[in-house]
């Protein structure tokens, strides 16, 4: 088989000992190509440890010459695929003990769209490729149905039975159906939301709960659900997560999207985190209210219908950094409702008021991320919670959201081996302490 290798640059890192709370990870972050005529964009590789050599890579392995295979800053890595072809994700690793759990996340589109397509997701354990999930009678374990606008997420965790002294952690997505396909594996992003592998410490989880995340870019920037999963693991809990996210999506949009509805209808969830578009709650009760509370109620009904045991969780999001910035298509609201956009504090207070009332009305849990956000801004302005666009969350912001979500579910102080993820220990500890103060002590 021929290999089309799409290289990623690995930053040189010193040797680090694999400690109980260290988290080897691979993330692919895209940069714009220096020459747009080149077939492949340049990539920047960040955050791997304790790996000290080699390159992380995304490869397409195929039986014959592909018709098209490019990287670009909009679509992704694309190839014409036939049965037996596969995408290969590799992360260099050293001294990874047997029993390590590896969490893998990516997103892809398949064409023809609006059809079910079958793949086998596998991982390398020693010298053997093993199914990441049980295979069915056709040799597959993963079905994707996508549209042009809505990629399908692929998120799973496996446990390695073999030690890796020096080698690669590897996953592959192999086509099992005969029909030729066009497969696009979505680009790594500077916002850090796609194509990741994270290794968890070698422990046995005390319990397993199944989670659903329904949201938008305030969910997927820096993958706060993945950080939540990492935090839970270090505290001894396995979070089995599913997700449907699309930028700018409101609850109304989720209700009308068949892919979003299908994820909800899979059922079996213990908790469902519901995140409305960040401007919508401000408009509650105004002439521009398009049924904001009603639509949240309908989504809660759907969750309870397919997962009767589930506890829906409404998330309080955060205000824009300056209150009136980065409004995009909602810019016209500044003149109509200036009282909501005076500054950050004004916007945040309105979000807290409306979303708290929604949770009370529908009898749901509440994830008070916005309250914790406000405390951090007041106490530690040196911790930048925002991405450079001044409204999406930075990695620190995602970590805070994940820590609050963890406290909402488990309501117990973090242990002494809590996960810091990519943050320095002092910053992570402070953000966790704020999550505890807000959820466990009711601080506002």
Annotate each language-model stretch with its function.
Residues 207, 385, 389-396, 402-444:
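Conserved catalytic region of serine esterases and O-acyltransferases that act on ester linkages
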Residues 19-53:
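Extracellular carbohydrate-recognition regions
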Residues 95-98, 108-117:
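Extended, low-complexity, turn-rich repeat/linker tracts enriched in Gly/Pro/Ser/Thr and Asp/Glu
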Residues 30, 129, 138-203:
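Terminal, low-complexity interaction segments
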Residues 1-22:
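Bacterial Sec-dependent N-terminal signal peptides
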Residues 49-98, 191-193:
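Surface-exposed, low-complexity/disordered Ser/Thr/Gly/Pro/Asn-rich loops and linkers
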